[in-house]
C-alpha cells in the first residue's frame, strides 16, 4: 500500500470539499482488535506531542510541521484498515473568510485529526485545556498550534479570555475552533452544548460552521484499572470508520439563533449516522 501525503490530502480537500481513503492507501484487511492495535493507533495520535517537544528547542517547529505530525492520525488509521471519510467543505471553500467552527467532541481523535484538515482552508486557532500547553517543552509549541488555553477553574474568566482572544484572532484572519460540549461525550446533548461559540461569532461578526465527527473507533476508557492513567485510550475497534462532516456556512446574526441553527444541523447529521442525541 502507498501512504497518503499531507499535500495530496489537503489538495483533495480544497479541490472537492472532501476526502475518502483511497483503496491503495489502506491496509487490505482491518487489524484485529487488541492491545497491539490500540497501542499502534494511540501512538499515531500522540506522537505529535513528543515530536513537537523535540524540535521546538531547536527553533524548527512550524505550523506546517505541526500539521504533518498531526497527519499521522489519518495515515495511522488507514494502516490499520480503517477508512477516513470527510465531506461537506465546499460551502466553506466558497466563503473563503474566517469562520467559527463548532464541533462535537467524542474522543482524542478529532483533536489531532482536525488540525491538518482545517489548515487546508487557512489558519485557525482553537480552545484547549491549559494543562496541555504547560506540558514539558510544549509551552512554546502551543504558540504554533494557535492554542487558546482555558483553566476550567473559573468559567467567567475562561469566557472572557475566549471572547477577547477569539475576537482578536478572527479579526486577524484566523478561523476559530470550539468544542461546545467542553469535554468528551458519546451523547450529543443540548444540556452539555455551550453557547460560547455562538457568542464569540456574534461579537467577532463572523459566520458559524458546524462540524460533526464520528470517532467511536477509540472511545474513552470508562472501566478497569487503567481508566485513570489511560482514560483517553480505550480499546480500538477497527470495524468503525472515522467520519467528519462539515455543515453550511451560517451567516452571522444573534447568538441565540446561531446557537440553535448549529445545534439543529449537528443533531440531525449525527442522528443520520445512528449516533445518540438528546434534544
Summary of predicted features, one role per range:
Residues 182:
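Active-site metal-binding loops of divalent metal-dependent hydrolases
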Residues 98-100, 173-179:
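Residue-level preference for the first positions of well-ordered beta-strands
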Residues 80-87, 159-160, 226-229:
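Short gly/ser/thr-rich secondary-structure transition/capping motifs
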Residues 138-139, 175, 186-256:
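A cross-family acyltransferase "interaction/gating" segment
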Residues 1-99, 112-113:
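Membrane-anchoring hydrophobic helices of lipid-metabolizing enzymes
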Amino acid at each position: 500500500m502507498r501512504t497518503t501525503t499531507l499535500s495530496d490530502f489537503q489538495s483533495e480537500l480544497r479541490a472537492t470539499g472532501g476526502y475518502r481513503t483511497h483503496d491503495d492507501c489502506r491496509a487490505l484487511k482491518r487489524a484485529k482488535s487488541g492491545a497491539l492495535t490500540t497501542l499502534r493507533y494511540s501512538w499515531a495520535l500522540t506522537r505529535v506531542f513528543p515530536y513537537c517537544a523535540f524540535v521546538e528547542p531547536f527553533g524548527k517547529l512550524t505550523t506546517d510541521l505541526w500539521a504533518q505530525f498531526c497527519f499521522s492520525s489519518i495515515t495511522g488509521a488507514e494502516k490499520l484498515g480503517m477508512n477516513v471519510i470527510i465531506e461537506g467543505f465546499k460551502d466553506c471553500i466558497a466563503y473563503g473568510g474566517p469562520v467559527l467552527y463548532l464541533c462535537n467532541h467524542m474522543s482524542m481523535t478529532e483533536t489531532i485529526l482536525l488540525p491538518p484538515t482545517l489548515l487546508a482552508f487557512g489558519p485557525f486557532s482553537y480552545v484547549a485545556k491549559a494543562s496541555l500547553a504547560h506540558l514539558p517543552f510544549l509551552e512554546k509549541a502551543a504558540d504554533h498550534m494557535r492554542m487558546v488555553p482555558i483553566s476550567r477553574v473559573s468559567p467567567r474568566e475562561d469566557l472572557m479570555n475566549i471572547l477577547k482572544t477569539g475576537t482578536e484572532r478572527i479579526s486577524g484572519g484566523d478561523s476559530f475552533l470550539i468544542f461546545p460540549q467542553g469535554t468528551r461525550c458519546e451523547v450529543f446533548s443540548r444540556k452539555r452544548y455551550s453557547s460560547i461559540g455562538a457568542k464569540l461569532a456574534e461579537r467577532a461578526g463572523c459566520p458559524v460552521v458546524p462540524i460533526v465527527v464520528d470517532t467511536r473507533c477509540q472511545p474513552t476508557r470508562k472501566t478497569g484499572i487503567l481508566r485513570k492513567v489511560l482514560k483517553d485510550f480505550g480499546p480500538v475497534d477497527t470495524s468503525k470508520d472515522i467520519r467528519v462532516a462539515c455543515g453550511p456556512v451560517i451567516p452571522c446574526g444573534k447568538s441565540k439563533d446561531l446557537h440553535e441553527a448549529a445545534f439543529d444541523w449537528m443533531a440531525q447529521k449525527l442522528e443520520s449516522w445512528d449516533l445518540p442525541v438528546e434534544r
